[in-house]
Amino acid sequence: MTTKSSAPTKSIPPLVIRSAIVASLGGLLFGFDTAVISGAEEKLTKLYALSSMGEGMIVAIATIGTICGAIVAGKLADRFGRKPILFWIGILFGVGALATALAPVPTLVTAADGTVSASSAFPITFFMVFRFLGGVGVGLSSVVAPIYTAEIAPARVRGRLVGLVQFNIVFGILLAYASNAVIREIAHEDTAWRWMLGVMAVPAVFFLIFLATVPETPRWLLAHGHEERAVKISERLTSTQEESSEQIAEMKAQIAEDAAGGKVAFFTRRYRKVILMAFCIAMFN
């Protein structure tokens, strides 16, 4: 004879769902920005008279920005808050999209030997700078969006909601390829690349608008002495007063433990295998 638990299943508060969806839009922008350049790369190579190295750089420069963004993301989010950094992620994506879409195109000069080159380095430099800034947004998003979701979500649904960020990264890549295909069919050949790059400003604007409707995380607020605000937000993020109190207590204990424990020596024999596995999974992904 089997027995069923009499404990009622707790529903997920609407604010938790909304906050997780908004944060996951950062993942969507991440994926979109990573893939969208593929549709414009061939045209850019011709317009800017790029060498093989130059062609590689217009793709790689965003990855370099991603590395830089990821390195500083944790410290920035700890100092200024998760939500402000998410805001700047939206700004970087939006500005990067519009600037690359409106980037100037150089006059091409043909030398006596038939070699074609750009008359000025400014246009490609302009394009590279804003591709780099978009990459910084990708790096920040890869760190801050999952942190925000994990700190907003109750423990019982945390894994599922953090997974939403990863899902939207892949969905953003798919959306970029689909967007490129549609634009290639409906836009003029000479301007299609601008639309491909600029269209990302649309989800970036929606991300910024929706971001205004979600709160800072209670954990960050507690860590910075804003307990009253943290408690109020926690009550909106949980189903019961008891659950909220438990989460606040757990956060306080964790913050105190982190403060007392100092820095963890990750790069030691004890953690070597786990860290190596994490790096390999991320690299091959």
How does the language model describe each region?
Residues 1-285:
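Transmembrane-helix signature of 12-pass secondary carriers
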